Structures are given as structure tokens and as C-alpha cells.
């Protein structure tokens, strides 16, 4: 890759720019994004091999691996899913409200208890 870039830069007839462009070249930026995916792929492979050796640690390691990949996916899906369910949600609360009414009598009972001590005192 570097060999290909050097000739292209040399054509510009600006050796100074060639050096600067090398520093500014997005090669560094491209490497950063590519590095995370690459390590992620080998990481699971290595872990999968180690668990076979350590049966006990196999349980925790695999458990953590699946969770990690899921976490990034869940957050992305969560915002999308809630939006769709949010519309059906309003109708859902309505049927749920009736059960809430029986709960309302409970709060009054609590105030009754304090009311009794008041006169008693």
C-alpha cells in the first residue's frame, strides 16, 4: 500500500507534501476502525479454545462473550423497538388501569393508621 501511495505522491512533484500527506493519510484512521473488528474476531476464537481447556472458566467466559455482542445490538434495537411498542402501549395501560383502582383503597388505609394515633395522642 505504501509503495502505491509513494508513486502517486511523487507524481504531484511535492516531496514535502508527500511526507505531510503520509502523516495526514487516512491510513491511520482506517487502521483504527479495522483493528477493533479484527481483534474482536480472533478474541472469540481464542476464548473458545481456552474454555475447552478450562471447563470451569468455560461457563463464565462464554456467558460474558454472548452478552458483550448482544449489548451493542440491544441498545440499537431498544430505541427502535420502544417507538413501535409505544403506540400499542397507550391501549395497554387502559386495561391495566382497572386493576390499579383496587390499589387506590390501600393508600387511604395507610392515612387511616396515622389518623388513629392522632386522636389517641
UniProtKB/Swiss-Prot annotation:
InterPro entries reported for this sequence: Amelogenin
GO biological process, one term: enamel mineralization
Biased composition regions of type Low complexity, renumbered to the chain: 60-84
Domain of life: Eukaryota
Location of this chain's protein in the cell: Secreted, Extracellular space, Extracellular matrix
Presence of keyword Secreted: yes
Biased composition (Polar residues): 10-19, 47-59
Principal location listed in the UniProt entry: secreted
Disulfide bond entries: none
Molecular function, one GO term: structural constituent of tooth enamel
GO CC annotations, alphabetized: extracellular region
One Pfam short name: Amelogenin
Job description of the protein: Plays a role in the biomineralization of teeth. Seems to regulate the formation of crystallites during the secretory stage of tooth enamel development. Thought to play a major role in the structural organization and mineralization of developing enamel.
Family: Belongs to the amelogenin family.
Protein name per Swiss-Prot or TrEMBL: Amelogenin
Lineage: Eukaryota, Metazoa, Chordata, Craniata, Vertebrata
Amino acid at each position: 500500500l505504501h509503495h502505491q501511495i509513494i508513486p502517486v505522491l511523487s507524481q504531484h512533484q511535492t516531496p514535502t507534501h508527500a511526507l505531510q500527506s503520509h502523516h495526514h493519510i487516512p491510513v491511520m484512521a482506517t487502521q483504527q476502525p479495522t483493528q477493533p473488528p479484527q481483534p474482536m474476531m480472533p478474541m472469540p476464537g481464542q476464548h473458545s479454545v481456552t474454555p475447552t481447556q478450562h471447563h470451569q472458566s468455560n461457563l463464565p467466559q462464554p456467558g460474558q462473550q454472548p452478552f458483550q455482542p448482544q449489548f451493542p445490538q440491544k441498545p440499537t434495537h431498544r430505541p427502535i423497538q420502544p417507538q413501535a411498542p409505544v403506540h400499542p402501549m397507550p391501549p395497554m395501560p387502559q386495561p391495566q388501569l382497572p386493576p390499579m383502582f383496587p390499589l387506590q383503597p390501600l393508600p387511604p388505609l395507610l392515612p387511616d393508621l396515622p389518623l388513629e394515633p392522632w386522636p389517641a395522642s
